[in-house]
UniProtKB/Swiss-Prot annotation:
SUPFAM superfamilies: Aminoacid dehydrogenase-like, N-terminal domain, NAD(P)-binding Rossmann-fold domains
UniProt protein name: L-tryptophan dehydrogenase
Superkingdom of the organism of origin: Bacteria
Organism: Nostoc punctiforme
UniProt record similarity statement: Belongs to the Glu/Leu/Phe/Val dehydrogenases family.
Positions bound to NAD(+): R44, D114, T146, G176, L177, G178, N179, V180, G181, K204, A255, A256, N257
Effect of V291A: 7-fold decrease in catalytic efficiency
Activity regulation note: Highly susceptible to inhibition by indole-3-pyruvate. Activity is not affected by the presence of metal ions, EDTA, KCl or DMSO.
Primary enzyme class: oxidoreductase
Gene: nptrpdh
Entry note about domains: Contains a substrate-binding domain and an NAD(+)/NADH-binding domain, separated by a deep cleft containing the active site. Several residues in the active site form a hydrophobic cluster, which may be a part of the hydrophobic core essential for protein folding.
Temperature characteristics of this protein: Optimum temperature is 45 degrees Celsius for oxidative deamination at pH 11.0. No enzyme activity is lost after incubation for 10 minutes at temperatures up to degrees 40 Celsius, but shows complete loss of activity at temperatures above 50 degrees Celsius.
Consequence the record notes for mutating L288M: 586-fold decrease in catalytic efficiency
Lineage: Bacteria, Bacillati, Cyanobacteriota, Cyanophyceae, Nostocales
Keyword Glycoprotein: no
Database matches in SMART domains: ELFV_dehydrog
Length: 353
C-alpha cells in the first residue's frame, strides 16, 4: 500500500499511528474530514492479520462516518480508531494509554464504543480524556435508536420499491442478532413480518426464535433465501462477488457497516440484479445521532425525532439514483459531498466578508 497516495485518494486530512512500549499499544486514528465539525468515530479492538488491514479498516470506516454525519445533518466530521490487539489481552493500562492519545488531539477526534469495546472500557478511556461518548448510563446505549433507524430505512425502501407502506406478510432475513439485530427483529415482528434469522452464536438465534417466532437458518444459508428483504446486521464486507449471485431479496437494508466489499463493483452488481440497496452509512446513522446528542446534552425525544429523518433521506437518495441513473451508493455519496461542499463554500464566503 502506498500510504500517502491511499490517504490522498480517500480524502483524509490526518492519520495518526499511535505507539507505546509501556504498555504495549499499536493504534491507528484516522480523521477523514472536519468540514462540518469535529471527527466522530468509535474505537474497535481487533487482532488484524497485518497493519495494512488495520489501516484499510480505519480509512474506510472514517470516510463512512463523514458521509454518515453529512447525510444525517449532524454537525460532525468522520473519524475512526482501531487498536491492533487481541481483545483477550485488553487491560486498563492499554485503554488509558489509548485515551491519552485521543486527548492529545484536543477534541479534533471524539470517540466511543465499537467492536470489543464495552461501556466499562469507555469509562476507563474517559479517565484520560473527556473526548469520549456513548457511555450507557447517559443515553441507554445506541442499539434501540440504531435499530429504529434501520427499521425506518426498511420502510422507506419498501415504499420506493413497491409504493407501499405496509410490511405485514413480507419475508425478511436478518443476519446477525446482536443488540441492534435483535431490536430490529422486535420492530419487524410487531409489524407481522415473517422472520428468518442467522447468527454464529446459536444461543442468540434460539432466543430470537423464542421471542419472535423466527425461523433459524445456518449462517451460510441466509444469502440464498427467497425473501423480500435482506438485513445484514453483523460484520462488513458480506456483499461481495461470492455472495451477491446467491441473493434473491429485492431489498438490502441492514445495520452492518461497510457491507459492500468493493463499493463501486458490488453496488453495480446489486443494481444489475435489480436489488435496491440502502446505503449502510445512511440507514445505520441512529448510533451517531445518539452519541452526538449525548455530547451536546442528551434529550431522548430530540434524538428519536432526528432518527426519523433517515426515512426521508433514503427516499431522497433513491430518487436521486433513479433521476441520475446511478447506484444508490453513488447517490448517497453525492448527497453527502454536496452538503460538505456547500459548508465549505459558506465558510469561504464568511472569511471573505
Amino acid at each position: 500500500m502506498l500510504l500517502f497516495e491511499t490517504v490522498r485518494e480517500m480524502g483524509h486530512e490526518q492519520v495518526l499511528f499511535c505507539h507505546s512500549k509501556n504498555p504495549e499499544i499499536k493504534a491507528i486514528i484516522a480523521i477523514h474530514d472536519t468540514t462540518l465539525g469535529p471527527a466522530m468515530g468509535a474505537t474497535r479492538i481487533l487482532p488484524y492479520i497485518n497493519e495494512e488491514a488495520a489501516l484499510k479498516d480505519a480509512l474506510r470506516l472514517s470516510r463512512g462516518m463523514t458521509y454518515k454525519a453529512a447525510c444525517a445533518n449532524i454537525p460532525a466530521g468522520g473519524g475512526k480508531a482501531v487498536i491492533i490487539a487481541n481483545p483477550e489481552n485488553k487491560t486498563d493500562d492499554l485503554l488509558r494509554a489509548y485515551g491519552r492519545f485521543v486527548d492529545s488531539l484536543n477534541g479534533r477526534f471524539i470517540t466511543g464504543q465499537d467492536v470489543n469495546i464495552t461501556p466499562d472500557d469507555v469509562r476507563t478511556i474517559s479517565q484520560e480524556t473527556k473526548y469520549v461518548v456513548g457511555v450507557s448510563e447517559k443515553s441507554g446505549g445506541p442499539a434501540p435508536i440504531t435499530s429504529l433507524g434501520v427499521f425506518l430505512g426498511i420502510k422507506a425502501a419498501v415504499e420506493s420499491r413497491w409504493q407501499s407502506k405496509r410490511l405485514d406478510g413480507m419475508k425478511v432475513a436478518v443476519q446477525g442478532l446482536g443488540n441492534v439485530g435483535k431490536n430490529l427483529c422486535r420492530h419487524l415482528h410487531e409489524h407481522d413480518v415473517q422472520l428468518f434469522v442467522s447468527d454464529v452464536d446459536p444461543i442468540k438465534a434460539e432466543e430470537v426464535k423464542r421471542l419472535f417466532g423466527a425461523t433459524v437458518v445456518e449462517p451460510t444459508e441466509i444469502y440464498s433465501l427467497d425473501v423480500d428483504i435482506f438485513a445484514p446486521c453483523a460484520l462488513g464486507g458480506i456483499l461481495n462477488s461470492h455472495t451477491i449471485p446467491f441473493l434473491q431479496a429485492s431489498i438490502i437494508a441492514g445495520a452492518a457497516n461497510n457491507q459492500l466489499e468493493n463499493e463501486q463493483l458490488h453496488s453495480q452488481m446489486l443494481a444489475k440484479k435489480g436489488i435496491l440497496y440502502s446505503p449502510d452509512y445512511v440507514i445505520n446513522a441512529g448510533g451517531l445521532i445518539n452519541v452526538y446528542n449525548e455530547m451536546i446534552g442528551y434529550d431522548e425525544e430530540k434524538a428519536f425525532k432526528q432518527v426519523h429523518n433517515i426515512y426521508d433521506t433514503l427516499l431522497a437518495i433513491f430518487e436521486i439514483a433513479k433521476e441520475q441513473g446511478v447506484t444508490t451508493n453513488d447517490a448517497a455519496r453525492r448527497l453527502a459531498e454536496d452538503r460538505i461542499n456547500n459548508s465549505k463554500r459558506s465558510k469561504s464566503k464568511a472569511i471573505a466578508a
